[in-house]
Amino acid sequence: MNRWRIPQWLEKEICARDVACVYCGITFGSAPDRGSQPSWEHIINDARIITRENIARCCRACNSSKGTKLLTDWLGSAYCLRRGISAGSVANVVKRALEHQPLAILD
């Protein structure tokens, strides 16, 4: 289990699936800057949901921009507009999350 509590078997599965950022599509390590390096992402911002449907890899730039925003809110941000990131352009794992994401998370 890594420091994000992702089991090793799931980490390997996700690394094989997500060879590029699930949001912007940049291939990891294709650019020399830190922003293109992979980072772990909870698509729905709930660290308790450790499933193949919620854990993904995205570039550090997208992860930093998304932060704790709801996915639907973030997709409408200036960052996403500038980079051409939309509900139609993201990876399939994100598209599936969008289909099931509640409009608001109640505590």
PLM region descriptions:
Residues R17-A20, N54-C58:
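Secretory pathway export signals and precursors
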Residues M1-G25, I49, L81-A104:
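Short, charged surface segments at domain edges that flank catalytic/cofactor-binding sites
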Residues G76:
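Phosphate-coordinating loops and pocket residues in cytosolic domains that bind phosphorylated ligands
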Residues G25-R57, K66-D73:
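Histidine-centered nuclease catalytic patch
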Residues C62:
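Short Cys/His-based metal-binding microdomains
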